[in-house]
């Protein structure tokens, strides 16, 4: 009986809070509101949200749990908010699962905007650009070469390449962050990331985020999430201890060495203190959560599209043969010279346009009263950029749903996509992700022709339960080794 009364009281308080919030906004010029809650049941939410723009325009509000959120569906509105008015929208809402995932200390991806957040972001970016800059490309190339050798051992037989890509990207992050690519560590971290993301994306956690007072009630999903986070932290702490015991001052073997030594030196602005070991811990978490499955998923989508478009694969291999010589599997195009392979760059851009890393960007929060597209945006408003929607806008892109890499080959023919976000919260791992996409596809297409199993082209539709990322539906591919004449699939 007490539980029933408590639930009733919490419901009444939530309703009163919602009504009070609506009353305070009565005199503002707000974006139009989508009534009801049925949008939460849509299987492909970004596409559904884009469809609403036909009658509501590129910006509108919809109800998400106990609050209204503003959705941005065009490149123009997204860039107005996140680039031109980035300070106004650099905040992050304090969602229950975000707080739980960041229990060690605020991280970069989920942490709210502050001076500490700026210093934390600077430390992690420096680790990527300075700490391992000279060794990043050689390590990615070496690990990709080992990956191709493993694939060669399975040549001609159907391979579930999504998992292989996932292990590859995890080994790259392990090598750059910990200086270690030992199989046991790689697979432990890979399984940890898989378990954490699967648990986090479960419907029970999504409901908890939308109706926060439910956290006071028993939840098996919440228990599983706490256990997954505990496992994650155990693995990271073990590496932190190992590095502190063995690192040499003034030298760094990997990003973790660099961050541990630099954290104490980077003072936060206005004398508010300095970064702590907990910040380094969460930087490592961000690198693994944001840098493994996202890149592996993009590589998987690239393979899917090339299986559906063998004429593009043939042209890509022709481009590689022309630049490197037929069958030159040992030759490389340095990433700084990537302009030598314009079609490959265009293909990567087109895959990222159609299947952005995160279709709905993580929510932003208005740090002060502002406006977007002429509408008032009160302080504290949650704003969600629909990146995939912006990439499929028919007013910007010709035949937006078609896979056409050539659209990026004509100078100025199309605007750049927003696959990694933009503004202050653009993905820190974008340079590494783009390097990985380039190196892996170069080596893969040099070494193999990608073929579907007999009569089994993969689906172009995302997995119906994709979660944060637009996941590929399970599929297999046959990797046919290329001979010395540079054979490709041939034009269709």
Curated annotation (Swiss-Prot):
Membrane topology: Peripheral membrane protein
Entry's localization field: Endoplasmic reticulum membrane; Microsome membrane
Residues binding 17alpha-hydroxyprogesterone, per UniProt: 232
Domain of life: Eukaryota
EC number(s) stated in the UniProt entry for this protein: 1.14.14.16
Gene Ontology molecular function: 17-hydroxyprogesterone 21-hydroxylase activity; heme binding; iron ion binding; progesterone 21-hydroxylase activity; steroid 21-monooxygenase activity; steroid binding; steroid hydroxylase activity
SUPFAM superfamilies, per the entry: Cytochrome P450 (SSF48264)
Reactions accelerated catalytically: progesterone + reduced [NADPH--hemoprotein reductase] + O2 = 21-hydroxyprogesterone + oxidized [NADPH--hemoprotein reductase] + H2O + H(+); 17alpha-hydroxyprogesterone + reduced [NADPH--hemoprotein reductase] + O2 = 11-deoxycortisol + oxidized [NADPH--hemoprotein reductase] + H2O + H(+)
Residues annotated as binding progesterone: 232
Protein's UniProt keywords contain Cell inner membrane: no
InterPro entries, A to Z: Cyt_P450, Cyt_P450_CS, Cyt_P450_E_grp-I, Cyt_P450_sf
GO biological process, one term: glucocorticoid biosynthetic process
Cofactor names: heme b
Residues binding heme b, per UniProt: 92, 121, 364, 425, 427
Keywords assigned: Endoplasmic reticulum, Heme, Iron, Lipid-binding, Membrane, Metal-binding, Microsome, Monooxygenase, Oxidoreductase, Steroid-binding, Steroidogenesis
Keyword NADP: no
GO CC annotations on file: endoplasmic reticulum membrane
Function: A cytochrome P450 monooxygenase that plays a major role in adrenal steroidogenesis. Mechanistically, uses molecular oxygen inserting one oxygen atom into a substrate, and reducing the second into a water molecule, with two electrons provided by NADPH via cytochrome P450 reductase (CPR; NADPH-ferrihemoprotein reductase).
Family named by the database record: Belongs to the cytochrome P450 family.
Free-text comment about domains: The leucine-rich hydrophobic amino acid N-terminal region probably helps to anchor the protein to the microsomal membrane.
UniProt-recorded name of the protein: Steroid 21-hydroxylase
Species of the source: Sus scrofa (Pig)
Lineage of the species this protein comes from: Eukaryota, Metazoa, Chordata, Craniata, Vertebrata
Gene this chain is encoded by: CYP21
């Amino acid at each position: 009986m007490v539980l029933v009364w408590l639930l009733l009281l919490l419901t009444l308080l939530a309703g009163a809070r919602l009504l009070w919030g609506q009353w305070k906004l009565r005199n503002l010029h707000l974006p139009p509101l989508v009534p009801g809650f049925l949008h939460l049941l849509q299987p492909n939410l970004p596409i559904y949200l884009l469809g609403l723009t036909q009658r509501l325009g590129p910006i509108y509000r919809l109800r998400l749990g106990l609050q209204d959120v503003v959705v941005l569906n065009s490149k123009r509105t997204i860039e107005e908010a996140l680039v031109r008015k980035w300070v106004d929208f650099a905040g992050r809402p304090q969602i229950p699962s975000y707080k739980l995932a960041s229990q060690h200390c605020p991280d970069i991806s989920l942490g709210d905007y502050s001076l500490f957040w700026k210093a934390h972001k600077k430390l992690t970016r420096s680790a990527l650009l300075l700490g391992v800059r000279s060794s990043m490309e050689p390590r990615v190339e070496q690990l990709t070469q080992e990956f191709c050798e493993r694939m060669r051992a399975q040549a001609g037989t159907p391979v579930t390449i999504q998992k292989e890509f996932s292990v590859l990207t995890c080994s790259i992050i392990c090598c750059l962050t910990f200086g270690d690519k030992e199989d046991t560590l790689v697979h432990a971290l890979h399984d940890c990331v898989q378990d954490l993301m699967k648990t986090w994306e479960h419907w029970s956690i999504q409901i908890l985020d939308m109706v926060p007072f439910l956290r006071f009630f028993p939840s098996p999903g919440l228990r599983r999430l706490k256990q997954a986070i505990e496992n994650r932290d155990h693995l990271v702490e073990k590496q932190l201890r190992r590095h502190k015991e063995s690192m040499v001052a003034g030298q760094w073997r990997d990003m973790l060495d660099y961050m541990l030594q630099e954290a104490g030196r980077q003072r936060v602005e206005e004398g508010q203190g300095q970064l702590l070991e907990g910040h380094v811990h969460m930087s490592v978490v961000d690198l693994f959560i944001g840098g493994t499955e996202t890149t592996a998923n993009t590589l998987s989508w690239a393979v899917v599209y090339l299986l559906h478009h063998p004429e593009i694969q043939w042209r890509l291999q022709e481009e590689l043969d022309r630049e490197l010589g037929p069958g030159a599997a040992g030759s490389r195009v340095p990433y700084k010279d990537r302009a030598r392979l314009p079609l490959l760059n265009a293909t990567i851009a087109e895959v990222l346009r159609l299947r952005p890393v995160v279709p709905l960007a993580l929510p932003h929060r208005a740090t002060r009263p502002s406006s977007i597209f002429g509408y008032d945006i009160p302080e504290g408003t949650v704003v969600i950029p629909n990146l995939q929607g912006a990439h499929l806008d028919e007013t910007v892109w010709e035949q937006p749903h078609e896979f056409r890499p050539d659209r990026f080959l004509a100078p100025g023919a199309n605007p750049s996509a927003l696959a990694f976000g933009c503004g202050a919260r653009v993905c820190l791992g974008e340079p590494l992700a783009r390097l990985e996409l380039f190196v892996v596809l170069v080596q893969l297409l040099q070494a193999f022709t990608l073929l579907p199993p007999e009569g089994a082209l993969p689906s172009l539709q995302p997995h119906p339960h994709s979660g944060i990322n637009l996941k590929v539906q399970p599929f297999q591919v046959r990797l046919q080794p290329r001979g010395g004449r540079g054979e490709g699939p041939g034009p269709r």
